[in-house]
Amino acid sequence: MTTIAKLIAVTIDCAEPRRLAEFYATILGFEVQYAEDEYAGIGDGAVSIYFQRVPERKPAAWPGPDKQFHLDVRVPDVDKAVQEYLELGAGRPDFQPGDGWVVLADPEGHLFCVCPERS
């Protein structure tokens, strides 16, 4: 039988770890665990997101096959959340693939989807 692993963190390559840690801590309600020039981390006690400095990283084209990864978040009011996230530095790509959720890009161009809570 295969040993089951527990996911403890996802690490995101970026040019400015401190900036992205603050952005995601704000929209997810996580605490900044540490923030340095090379590495930063946020978490909620169960899972963490780490940000690793990779200055040569280039944002993926959207839409396109090289988007690398994206996060999905659930919110009670998609329109309200999107407006708040845009004010925090997110961007809204022109191409939106469907209705009911919105694709945004964080301040460094990583894509994430803002999805409604399930009823």
Label every model-predicted segment.
Residues 1-34, 43-93, 105-119:
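Glyoxalase I/VOC metalloenzyme domain signal
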Residues 36-38:
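Short glycine/proline-centered loop/turn elements that form peptide/ligand docking sites
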Residues 97-99:
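Short, small/polar residue-rich loop motifs at catalytic or cofactor-binding pockets
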